[in-house]
């Protein structure tokens, strides 16, 4: 990982924006280390990750075993209107993971609590599009994940 951090710094002019070690990112069974790289204006950020020793294979090790090489697992983009963006991407052939069970969407008001007052999106529409909702003390987050984009066949 440090080789790639150095490459992005020296060749691309990126900076190491944040770093996390295996004490900060871990479960009972696996852990990882991550260095988040950022371009000069901060509009592009991405993590460089590597597995840390754990009781089981990490998600990174499973990815490497399956694809037999490093690569891009997923890409995050920002949008001011996730509903329109997802509709446009779907119309252009992008496939997303399936929606969680109905109970996930039924529980959103309870999970979001006070954030429901500022949420403008319709829960039925979020469910229809399989958009996920998370919240913390700073606000709420809408997100969706594509199916794997790599094809090794």
Task: Identify the residue ranges that each predicted region occupies.
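Glyoxalase I/VOC metalloenzyme domain signal
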Residues: 1-17, 26-153
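Eukaryotic intrinsically disordered and solvent-exposed regulatory patches
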Residues: 22-24
């Amino acid at each position: 990982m440090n080789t790639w951090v150095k490459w992005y710094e020296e060749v691309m002019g990126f900076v190491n924006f944040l770093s996390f070690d295996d004490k900060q990112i871990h479960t009972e069974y696996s852990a990882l280390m991550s260095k988040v790289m950022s371009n000069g204006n901060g509009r592009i950020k991405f993590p460089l990750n590597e597995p840390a020793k754990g009781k089981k294979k990490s998600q990174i090790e499973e990815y490497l075993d399956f694809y037999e090489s490093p690569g891009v697992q997923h890409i995050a983009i920002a949008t001011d209107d996730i509903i329109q963006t997802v509709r446009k991407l779907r119309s252009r052939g992008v496939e997303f993971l399936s929606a969680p069970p109905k109970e996930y969407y039924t529980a959103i008001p309870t999970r979001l609590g006070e954030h429901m007052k500022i949420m403008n999106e319709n829960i039925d529409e979020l469910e229809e599009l399989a958009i996920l909702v998370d919240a913390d003390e700073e606000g709420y987050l809408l997100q969706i994940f594509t199916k794997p984009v790599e094809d090794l066949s």
